[in-house]
């Protein structure tokens, strides 16, 4: 197993649209700027709008009726409140216990 005689850092050229090769990975220089067309001058846009209004066909417009507008001020509902905890013990309540009748023992039989 030997090392190759070629250096892996070959091709480190200037970044003027040229390609860099570092450690076997190619890295391209920065991207070129994208050129786009300019918008039409305002004079042309107004002519198109005038043609739209002059024709018999209606152009699409944004609805301006009161029903379609978003209300300016919406009232939020109040924040939810915690429920009161159920009372576990009532000290004022008088408890009435069952008082057995005096002849209850006659119901049960004694076994010998």
From Swiss-Prot:
Molecular function via GO: protein kinase inhibitor activity
* Keywords for this protein: Cell cycle, Protein kinase inhibitor
The superkingdom of the source organism is Eukaryota
The keyword Iron belongs to this UniProt entry's keyword annotation: no
Stated role: Probable cyclin-dependent protein kinase (CDK) inhibitor that functions as a repressor of mitosis in the endoreduplication cell cycle. May inhibit CDKA-1/CYCD complexes during S-phase, preventing the re-initiation of DNA replication.
Quaternary structure, per UniProt, is: Interacts with CDKA-1 and D-type cyclins.
Q: What is the name of the protein in this document?
A: Cyclin-dependent protein kinase inhibitor SMR6
Q: Which organism is it from?
A: Arabidopsis thaliana
């Amino acid at each position: 197993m030997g090392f190759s005689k070629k250096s892996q850092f070959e091709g480190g050229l200037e970044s003027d649209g040229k390609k860099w090769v570092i450690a076997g990975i190619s890295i391209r220089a920065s991207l070129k700027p994208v050129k786009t067309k300019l918008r039409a001058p305002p004079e042309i846009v107004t002519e198109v709008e005038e043609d739209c209004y002059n024709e018999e066909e209606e152009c699409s417009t944004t609805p301006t009726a009161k029903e379609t507008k978003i209300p300016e001020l919406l009232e939020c509902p109040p924040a939810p409140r915690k429920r009161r905890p159920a009372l576990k013990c009532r000290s004022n309540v008088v408890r009435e216990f069952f008082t057995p009748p005096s002849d209850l023992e006659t119901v049960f039989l004694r076994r010998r």
